[in-house]
């Protein structure tokens, strides 16, 4: 993580004001300070900055109006009437952080909203939708194959970009084979996209240093690690000569920058996904104490393999292997610290956590889909869009489950909403690092148990323990565990992405 200078903070705030992220273009309003700070911390991976210091810098540089003395607390002081002091604000690392990437285009009738640092971002309807309406379709920003498809993709049976069967290719002559490995692509479009966003850096025939990483992913069927690798490859591809058309002067050379974005655009998009350390997720697993040592060991192995494969500054890169494709011409002084930080172990833990809490159930990171918050009474469902009479694993559609009105938040269910209250709360807490869920359904069921969640009074884990205790069966009438109960631990481990 980076400790920003005052100049860096000022420059970043001015850039946000100019981009229209705030409601005014010249100053930051008091009610926008915390949201802006959370956004900048995540986007630039800054160390936690006290709100007091942030406000002081904004006021000093006339980026925020100074509060009047009779407003209670001034922006330059933590002193309040009665001699009390405000508690220093620090970001809770157990809560996933996200922000809205201003380059995202929202479909008609939908807007993106940043609610607060805890809930993060979401989607809200700006017009009415009827039950069954299609609200949007979306292709994966980072396509990642389902674990069961790894072997078929590696052997060339499935397209390495869209993961549809090669045999279903619309035109046999359009099938493209990688000349350096067994990966195949079902169309010219899939081939061009893959080469521009990941395959050039992850192909073991082109980048021999990537072989241990790919072997680890395939051996462990480690989907979240594969997602991290493809995410970083997409970012680093923006720093290659091929990406900028310098390696191929043909007239039909694809303008990759215009199609897929430059370094800053891709970095901002990836950073905007909700992010939390994988260690935070793992620590909520009931078997964490037992598996901690072995898991941390394989994480270090994965981190080492990732750095050897993709880190432009890795000291362990084999100089005798084919030259790395990232060009020093594009590694300027601004990008260098960002890239170095991306490959440190702590950031790697965050990248794995980001992949696990954002990937759609079949894999892949989706820009709009990642905005959707959870409710046990969802008004949307996500379906996969058929292509060539086959359900495409990397294209989704959002369908209204009921009538939706203007200003309604668009929500999906991350889990099976028909399971018990205690089980839903448990899975959401462990898999998605939030809770307790207080949607209408949960609030009603909690109320029936005499429970009302108050964040000012209740610690999350203690409250969830109360829910479990209240819903526990009478010990005098306990039945033998069902197959569903006995596999809960297995399901939890699977849902943790490893």
UniProtKB/Swiss-Prot annotation:
Region (Disordered): 68-94
GO biological process, one term: methylation
Reaction catalysed by this enzyme: L-lysyl-[histone] + S-adenosyl-L-methionine = N(6)-methyl-L-lysyl-[histone] + S-adenosyl-L-homocysteine + H(+)
Gene3D superfamilies the record matches: 1.10.220.160, 6.10.140.2220, SET domain
Catalytic activity, EC: 2.1.1.-
Molecular function in Gene Ontology: histone H4K20 methyltransferase activity
All residue ranges annotated as the SET domain in the record: 108-415
Domain of life assignment: Eukaryota
GO cellular component, one term: nucleus
UniProt xrefs under CDD domains: SET_SMYD (cd20071)
Subcellular location: Nucleus; Chromosome; Cytoplasm
Enzyme class, spelled out: transferase
UniProt xrefs under InterPro entries: SET_dom, SET_dom_sf
Keywords linked to the UniProt accession: Chromosome, Cytoplasm, Methyltransferase, Nucleus, S-adenosyl-L-methionine, Transferase
Annotated Pfam families: SET
UniProt record similarity statement: Belongs to the class V-like SAM-binding methyltransferase superfamily. Histone-lysine methyltransferase family. SET5 subfamily.
PANTHER family from the UniProt entry: HISTONE-LYSINE N-TRIMETHYLTRANSFERASE SMYD5, SET AND MYND DOMAIN-CONTAINING PROTEIN 5
Role description: Histone methyltransferase that monomethylates 'Lys-5', 'Lys-8' and 'Lys-12' of histone H4 (H4K5me1, H4K8me1 and H4K12me1, respectively), thereby controlling gene expression and remodeling chromatin structures.
Name this polypeptide is given: Histone-lysine N-methyltransferase SET5
Annotated source species: Mycosarcoma maydis
Lineage of the species this protein comes from: Eukaryota, Fungi, Dikarya, Basidiomycota, Ustilaginomycotina
């Amino acid at each position: 993580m980076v400790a920003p200078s005052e100049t860096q903070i000022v420059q970043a705030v001015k850039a946000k004001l100019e981009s229209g992220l705030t409601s005014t273009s010249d100053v930051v309003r008091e009610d926008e300070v915390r949201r802006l700070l959370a956004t900048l911390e995540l986007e630039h991976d800054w160390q936690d900055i006290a709100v007091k210091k942030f406000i002081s810098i904004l006021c000093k540089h006339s980026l925020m109006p100074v509060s009047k003395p009779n407003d209670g607390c001034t922006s330059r002081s933590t002193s309040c009437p009665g001699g009390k002091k405000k508690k220093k604000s620090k970001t809770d690392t157990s809560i996933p952080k996200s922000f809205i990437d201003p380059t995202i285009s929202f479909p008609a009738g939908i807007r993106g909203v940043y609610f607060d640092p805890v809930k993060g971002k979401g989607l809200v309807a700006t017009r009415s939708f009827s039950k069954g309406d299609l609200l949007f379709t979306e292709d994966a920003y980072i396509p990642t194959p389902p674990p069961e498809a790894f072997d078929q993709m590696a052997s060339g049976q499935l397209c390495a970009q869209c993961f549809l069967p090669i045999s279903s290719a619309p035109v046999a002559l359009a099938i493209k084979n990688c000349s350096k490995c067994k990966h195949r692509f079902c169309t010219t479009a899939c081939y061009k996209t893959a080469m521009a966003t990941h395959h050039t850096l992850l192909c073991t025939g082109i980048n021999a240093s990537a072989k241990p990483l790919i072997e680890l992913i395939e051996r462990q069927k480690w989907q979240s690690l594969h997602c991290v690798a493809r995410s970083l490859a997409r970012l680093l591809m923006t720093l290659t000569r091929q990406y900028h058309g310098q390696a191929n002067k043909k007239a039909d050379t694809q303008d990759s920058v215009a199609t897929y974005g430059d370094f800053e655009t891709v970095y901002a998009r990836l950073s905007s996904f909700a992010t939390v350390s994988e260690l935070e997720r793992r620590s909520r697993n009931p078997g964490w104490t037992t598996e901690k040592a072995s898991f941390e060991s394989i994480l270090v192995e994965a981190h080492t393999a990732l750095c050897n494969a993709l880190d432009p500054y890795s000291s362990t890169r084999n100089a005798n292997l084919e030259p790395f494709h990232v060009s020093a011409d594009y590694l300027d002084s601004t990008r260098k610290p960002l890239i170095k930080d991306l490959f440190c172990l702590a950031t790697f833990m965050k990248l794995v956590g980001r992949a696990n809490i954002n990937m759609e159930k079949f894999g892949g990171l989706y820009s709009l889909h990642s905005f959707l918050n959870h409710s046990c009474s969802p008004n949307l469902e996500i379906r996969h869009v058929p292509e060539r009479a086959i359900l495409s694993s990397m294209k989704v559609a959002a369908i209204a489950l009921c009538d939706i009105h203007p200003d309604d938040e668009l929500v999906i269910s991350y889990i099976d909403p028909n399971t018990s209250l205690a089980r839903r709360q448990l899975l959401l807490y462990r898999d998605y690092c939030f809770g307790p869920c207080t949607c209408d359904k949960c609030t009603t069921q909690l109320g029936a148990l005499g429970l009302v969640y108050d964040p000012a009074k209740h610690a999350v884990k203690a409250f969830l323990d109360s829910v479990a205790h209240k819903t526990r069966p009478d010990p005098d009438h306990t039945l033998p565990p069902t197959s569903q109960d006995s596999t809960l631990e297995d399901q939890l481990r699977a849902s943790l992405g490893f």
